């Protein structure tokens, strides 16, 4: 416990919360250009080929971003929108690409959770 005199001299320091998505620079999303589109394997108990792209953002950062959903149309110079949100079993992937925005097409034949994958409402 600090004495009154110590508190007068120094005061209490407030803990500064570190951002989990520093590349977004306090914005909800950021635009960027794909520099590399590739697949990678997840951490130990899981097994898959996860689709990931390396993106150079307008904020100057270059980050890895996960491409959710089944199938995608991204290539090297595609312009994509990035949001925060990590992928637990891919180390270093702290961002998601927004499907159905800019050059990233929505998921085809998606009927549930459509808004998360940029899919339009199917015709009856």
From Swiss-Prot:
It comes from the Bacteria. The modification 3-methylthioaspartic acid is found at residue 89. It holds the Pfam family Ribosom_S12_S23. One of its GO terms (biological process) is translation. CDD domains: Ribosomal_S12 (cd03368). The keyword RNA-binding applies. One of its GO terms (molecular function) is structural constituent of ribosome. InterPro entries: NA-bd_OB-fold (IPR012340), Ribosomal_uS12 (IPR006032), Ribosomal_uS12_bac (IPR005679). Keywords: Methylation, Ribonucleoprotein, Ribosomal protein, RNA-binding, rRNA-binding, tRNA-binding. Signal peptide: none annotated. One of its GO terms (cellular component) is small ribosomal subunit. The keyword tRNA-binding applies. With S4 and S5 plays an important role in translational accuracy. Interacts with and stabilizes bases of the 16S rRNA that are involved in tRNA selection in the A site and with the mRNA backbone. Located at the interface of the 30S and 50S subunits, it traverses the body of the 30S subunit contacting proteins on the other side and probably holding the rRNA structure together. The combined cluster of proteins S8, S12 and S17 appears to hold together the shoulder and platform of the 30S subunit. Belongs to the universal ribosomal protein uS12 family. Part of the 30S ribosomal subunit. Contacts proteins S8 and S17. May interact with IF1 in the 30S initiation complex. This is Small ribosomal subunit protein uS12. It comes from Acinetobacter baumannii (strain AB0057). The lineage of its organism: Bacteria, Pseudomonadati, Pseudomonadota, Gammaproteobacteria, Moraxellales.
């Amino acid at each position: 416990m600090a004495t009154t005199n110590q508190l007068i001299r120094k005061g209490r320091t407030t803990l500064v919360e570190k951002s989990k998505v520093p590349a977004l620079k306090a914005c909800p999303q950021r635009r960027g250009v794909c520099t590399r589109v590739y697949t990678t394997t997840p951490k130990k108990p899981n097994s898959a080929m996860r689709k990931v792209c390396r993106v150079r953002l307008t904020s100057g950062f270059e980050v890895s971003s996960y491409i959710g959903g089944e199938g995608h149309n991204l290539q090297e110079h595609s312009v994509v929108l990035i949001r925060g949100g990590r992928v637990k079993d891919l180390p270093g992937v702290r961002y998601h690409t927004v499907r159905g925005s800019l050059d990233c097409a929505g998921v085809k034949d998606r009927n549930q959770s459509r808004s998360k994958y940029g899919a339009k409402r199917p015709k009856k």
